[in-house]
C-alpha cells in the first residue's frame, strides 16, 4: 500500500509540472523534471519493491562515502510518471538529461528509448513515439560501475553515480531547432575574425524538420547587453543545416574580469509568419593567443592567468550540486581574485560555465581522459570502446559549450602515463590517439587553443596540442627553487611551445598543525599541517610571479574533495589539497595568501589561527596582507612594525609566548582606514 501511495504521488506531481509549464505561449516549452522520482537497486527486482523517494539532482553516494575509502559502484533504477495532456498531441517530446553518471538506459512505457555512455555530458532522446495521452512510465537504469568503454577509466576522484544533474521534458513543434544534435543548443556562434573595429561571425543552426515545407525561414538577431539590435539576418530554409554570416561594427569585447560583456544571439524558425521555435544563446566576442616567452594575451593585452582546478564535489551532496553550490563557489573564486579556472577532470555542469561567462573568469575545460597520477595503471586503452567514447564525449563537450566566451582552452588529457623505460610500464602508447583527439578539437573548433596536463616527460607529447602544461608537486621546504629550476628547464626544452602549470600544491588539514620553525623536520606520513601547505604555496608563487612566460598557473585544488584511494590528513577518503574545506565553510591560510596577492582590496590576515594550543614558547607570527606595512601586538603590547615583502607576506620571528592566553593582533592602514585581525594562542 505504501508503494501504491508513492506511485500516486508521482503521477500527481508529474501532472502538476507538465500542465503548468505547457500553458506557456512560447513555441518551445521546457519542463523541469526534478520532483516525483524514486529509486532502488536493480538487484531488488521484486515487482512491487518500494522506491526511495528522491528529488533531482541525486547521487546514491552523497553521504555514504564520508570518512571512508569505499563507495558504491553499482546499478540503480530511477522511476517516475509522465502525464501527457491532450494539448501535447501533435507536438514533439524530448527528454533532456544534463548528466547521468555514468551509463544510462532510458525506458518509456517499458520500451527502450536509448542509451548514453558518459557521466558528465548531456544527452537528449526523442520520446514522441513512445508516449500516449495520460500516464506514462519513465525508467532510467543508471550505473557507475567500472567499464573500459566509458571515460574515465581511472582518476583520483570518485565516480558518484546517479541522475546527478537536472532533467527536462522539452516540447516543440514538428519542425524545430534540433535539441538532439549532441544535446547541444543547436545554435553555434562561430567567431571568424574579431577585432576592436568589427566582429565577423557565422551563426550555424541545426534544424530537425519532420515536415519540410515551403516558406520555412530562419531569422537570427544579435542584441547587445541593453537589448539593442546590432545585427540580423534572414535566410530561407532548404535543409537541416543553415549558416548565416553577420558583422558587428565596433563591438564591445568580452574582456575577462575587466568587462565580461555579453551579447545575446536569438535564432527563430518561422513557417510564413508563424513562429515555430526559438533558441537564444548568450556569448561574448574576444580574441586571444599564448606566447612562449611572454605568456597569455586577451584582446591584445597581457593577462596573468591564475586560479584553481575545481571538481564538482560538495560535502553531503557529492556531484549532485544545486544552484546555491555554484553561487557559493563563484563567490569564493571572486573573493580570492582568480582570473581563470581549470574545470577538472571532465565537463562540468552548465551553471559553472554561465557564471564564468558573467564574471569574466577564463576557463580550461576537458574530457575525462585522465590517468591515475601516482597510482597503478594508466588512463588510456587502445580499444574501440574507449576511443569511441572519447570521441563522443569530446563532440558533446564542444557542441554543448561552444558559445561560452569564458572557454579559451580545450583539455585533451590529464596525467596519461607512458612507457619511459624507467618508472612506468609498457602501457598502450597514447600518443597517436592524443594527436587524433587534438585534430578533432581543431576540426570542430579552430578558434580555441588545446592543452594537455602531463606528469611525465613532456617530450613524449610535444606537438600533441597548442599548449604544454605540467602537474608538478615539490616538497614543503624548497618549492621556490625547485619550481624555478623545473619550469625554466621545461621552457627551454618545449620546442617553442608555451608552457604552463596545470596543477601544483600541497595537502592541509585545518585540524593538524606544526610550527613553521620546524619545517626542515621529517613529517609523519599522512600528516598535513595547515602551516606547511601555506609555506609550500608561498614558494611556488614566488617562483611563478617571476616567470611571466608561464601561460597559466592552476592550483590543485579549489576545495577538498572525495577520493576513495586517499588515506592522509585527518580523514580517510579525502584529498585535502583544497584552499577551502570540503563544505566550503573554512578558508585555509593558503586561500588568504592568494587573496593578498590576487585581490587588490585591502586585507590583513594572521596565519595559524586554528593552531590554538602551543607547547613551545618560541614561535613566529606570519601575516598575509596587501597593505604596505602592519604592526604586531601581543596582549596589547606592541612588538613592532614591518613592511610586506614582494609576495605580500610579513613574518615576525623569535616571538616568545607567555603561559596562558596570548591575544595576537595586527593592524595596518590603507589611506585613513585601519584594518585589524586577531586570534588567540594558548601556551600550555
Positions of the model-derived regions?
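Secreted/periplasmic carbohydrate-active enzymes, especially glycoside hydrolases
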Residues: 1-345, 355, 360-363, 393, ...
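Substrate-binding/catalytic cleft of secreted carbohydrate-active enzymes
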Residues: 204, 330-333, 340-586, 590-594, ...
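Oxidoreductase and adenylate-handling cofactor-binding alpha/beta cores
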Residues: 599-600
Amino acid at each position: 500500500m505504501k508503494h501504491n501511495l508513492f506511485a500516486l504521488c508521482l503521477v500527481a506531481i508529474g501532472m502538476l509540472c507538465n500542465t503548468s509549464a505547457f500553458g506557456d505561449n512560447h513555441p518551445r516549452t521546457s519542463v523541469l523534471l526534478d520532483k516525483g522520482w524514486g529509486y532502488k537497486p536493480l538487484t531488488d527486482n521484486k515487482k512491487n519493491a518500494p522506491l526511495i523517494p528522491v528529488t533531482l539532482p541525486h547521487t546514491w553516494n552523497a553521504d555514504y562515502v564520508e570518512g571512508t575509502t569505499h563507495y558504491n559502484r553499482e546499478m540503480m533504477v530511477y522511476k517516475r510518471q509522465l502525464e501527457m495532456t491532450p494539448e501535447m498531441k501533435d507536438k514533439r517530446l524530448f527528454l533532456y538529461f544534463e548528466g547521468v553518471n555514468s551509463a544510462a538506459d532510458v525506458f518509456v512505457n517499458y520500451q527502450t528509448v536509448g542509451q548514453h555512455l558518459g557521466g558528465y555530458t548531456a544527452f537528449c532522446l526523442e520520446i514522441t513515439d513512445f508516449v500516449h495521452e495520460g500516464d506514462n512510465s519513465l525508467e532510467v537504469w543508471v550505473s557507475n560501475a567500472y567499464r573500459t568503454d566509458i571515460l574515465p577509466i581511472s582518476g583520483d576522484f570518485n565516480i558518484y553515480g546517479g541522475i546527478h544533474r537536472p532533467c527536462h521534458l522539452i516540447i516543440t513543434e514538428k519542425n524545430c531547432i534540433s535539441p538532439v544534435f549532441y544535446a547541444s543548443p543547436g545554435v553555434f556562434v562561430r567567431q571568424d575574425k574579431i577585432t576592436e573595429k568589427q566582429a565577423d561571425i557565422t551563426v550555424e543552426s541545426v534544424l530537425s524538420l519532420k515536415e519540410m515545407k515551403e516558406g520555412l525561414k530562419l531569422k537570427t538577431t544579435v542584441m547587445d547587453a541593453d537589448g539593442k539590435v546590432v545585427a540580423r539576418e534572414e535566410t530561407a530554409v532548404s535543409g537541416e543545416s543553415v549558416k548565416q554570416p553577420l558583422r558587428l561594427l565596433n563591438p564591445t569585447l568580452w574582456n575577462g574580469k575587466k568587462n565580461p560583456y555579453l551579447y545575446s544571439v536569438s535564432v527563430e524558425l518561422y513557417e510564413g509568419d508563424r513562429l515555430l521555435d526559438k533558441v537564444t544563446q548568450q556569448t561574448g566576442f574576444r580574441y586571444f593567443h599564448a606566447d612562449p616567452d611572454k605568456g597569455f594575451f586577451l584582446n591584445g593585452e597581457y593577462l596573468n592567468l591564475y586560479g584553481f582546478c575545481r571538481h564538482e564535489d560538495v560535502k553531503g551532496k557529492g556531484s549532485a550540486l544545486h544552484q546555491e553550490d555554484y553561487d557559493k563557489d563563484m563567490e569564493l573564486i571572486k573573493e580570492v581574485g582568480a582570473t581563470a579556472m581549470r574545470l577538472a577532470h571532465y565537463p562540468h555542469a552548465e551553471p559553472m560555465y554561465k557564471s564564468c561567462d558573467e564574471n569574466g573568469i577564463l576557463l580550461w575545460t576537458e574530457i575525462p581522459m585522465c590517468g591515475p597520477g601516482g597510482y597503478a595503471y594508466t588512463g588510456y586503452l587502445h580499444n574501440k570502446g574507449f576511443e569511441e567514447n572519447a570521441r563522443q564525449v569530446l563532440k558533446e563537450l564542444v557542441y554543448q559549450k561552444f558559445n561560452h566566451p569564458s572557454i579559451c582552452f580545450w583539455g585533451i588529457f590529464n596525467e596519461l602515463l607512458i612507457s619511459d623505460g624507467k618508472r612506468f610500464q609498457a602501457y598502450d602508447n597514447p600518443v597517436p590517439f592524443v594527436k587524433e583527439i587534438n585534430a578533432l578539437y581543431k576540426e570542430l573548433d579552430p578558434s580555441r587553443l588545446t592543452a594537455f596536463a602531463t606528469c611525465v616527460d613532456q617530450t613524449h607529447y610535444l606537438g600533441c596540442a597548442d599548449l604544454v602544461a605540467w602537474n608538478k608537486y615539490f616538497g614543503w621546504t624548497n618549492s621556490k627553487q625547485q619550481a624555478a629550476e623545473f619550469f625554466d628547464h621545461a621552457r627551454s626544452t618545449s620546442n617553442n611551445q608555451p608552457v604552463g602549470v596545470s596543477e601544483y600544491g600541497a595537502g592541509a588539514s585545518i585540524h593538524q598543525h606544526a610550527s613553521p620553525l620546524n619545517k626542515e623536520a621529517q613529517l609523519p606520513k599522512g600528516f598535513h599541517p595547515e602551516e606547511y601547505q601555506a609555506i609550500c604555496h608561498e614558494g611556488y608563487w614566488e617562483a611563478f610571479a617571476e616567470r611571466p612566460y608561464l601561460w597559466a598557473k592552476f592550483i590543485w585544488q579549489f576545495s577538498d574533495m572525495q577520493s576513495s584511494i586517499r588515506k592522509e590528513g585527518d580523514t580517510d577518503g579525502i584529498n585535502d589539497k583544497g584552499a577551502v574545506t570540503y563544505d566550503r565553510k573554512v578558508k585555509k591560510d593558503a586561500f588568504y595568501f592568494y587573496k593578498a596577492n590576487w585581490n587588490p582590496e585591502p586585507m590583513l590576515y594572521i596565519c595559524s589561527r586554528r593552531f590554538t594550543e602551543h607547547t613551545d614558547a618560541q614561535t613566529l607570527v606570519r601575516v598575509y596582507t596587501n597593505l604596505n606595512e602592519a604592526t604586531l601586538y601581543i596582549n596589547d603590547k606592541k612588538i613592532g612594525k614591518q613592511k610586506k615583502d614582494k609576495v605580500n607576506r610579513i613574518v615576525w620571528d623569535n616571538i616568545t609566548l607567555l603561559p596562558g592566553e596570548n591575544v595576537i593582533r595586527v593592524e595596518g592602514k590603507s589611506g585613513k582606514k585601519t584594518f585589524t585581525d586577531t586570534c588567540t594562542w594558548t601556551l600550555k
